[in-house]
């Protein structure tokens, strides 16, 4: 599936995504974030942030950057960030296979439920490695 088609599909589901998939993936997201043991001021990238279901679970003492290719999904995530007053969260529309971040930008990269939903998972994993600092963590 090409990137444009993926974007259309996810944008079409954006407003109902949480009701359909929220409970299904909640336990996995929660487990990932609880086991992060994130340190104060840690910079965390969430690849495929979607509607931002996991955003309220992250510790507020960390800087969270979320990316997604679907504008519709990001709109939902932005609403959640505003509702929960998450000043520590930045959201960007971006292709996970061609991230616009500098090398070694993040302490931790989280990509839950993403690699099966992208056209070229190898590019995405390669980019995650590139933007994660040496000694950092990549969690999928």
What are these regions (language model features)?
Residues 43, 63, 135-137:
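Short glycine-centered segments of the SAM/dcSAM-binding site in methyltransferase folds
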Residues 122-137:
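A short glycine-rich, Lys/Arg-flanked "PGG" loop and its adjoining helix->strand segment in the class I
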Residues 97-109:
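A short acidic, Gly/Pro-enriched loop at the edge of an enzyme's catalytic core
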Residues 1-40, 53-54, 76:
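Conserved class I S-adenosyl-L-methionine
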């Amino acid at each position: 599936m090409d990137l444009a088609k993926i974007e259309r599909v996810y944008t079409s589901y954006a407003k109902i995504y949480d009701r359909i998939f929220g409970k299904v993936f909640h336990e996995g997201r929660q487990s990932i974030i609880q086991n992060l043991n994130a340190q104060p001021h840690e910079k965390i990238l969430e690849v495929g942030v979607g509607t931002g279901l996991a955003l309220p679970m992250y510790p507020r003492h960390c800087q969270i950057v979320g990316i997604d290719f679907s504008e519709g999904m990001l709109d939902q995530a932005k609403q959640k960030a505003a509702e929960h007053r998450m000043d520590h969260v930045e959201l960007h529309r971006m292709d996970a296979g061609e991230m616009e971040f500098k090398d070694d930008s993040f302490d931790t990269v989280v990509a839950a439920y993403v690699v099966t939903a992208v056209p070229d998972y190898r590019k995405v994993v390669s980019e995650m490695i590139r933007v994660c600092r040496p000694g950092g963590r990549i969690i999928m």
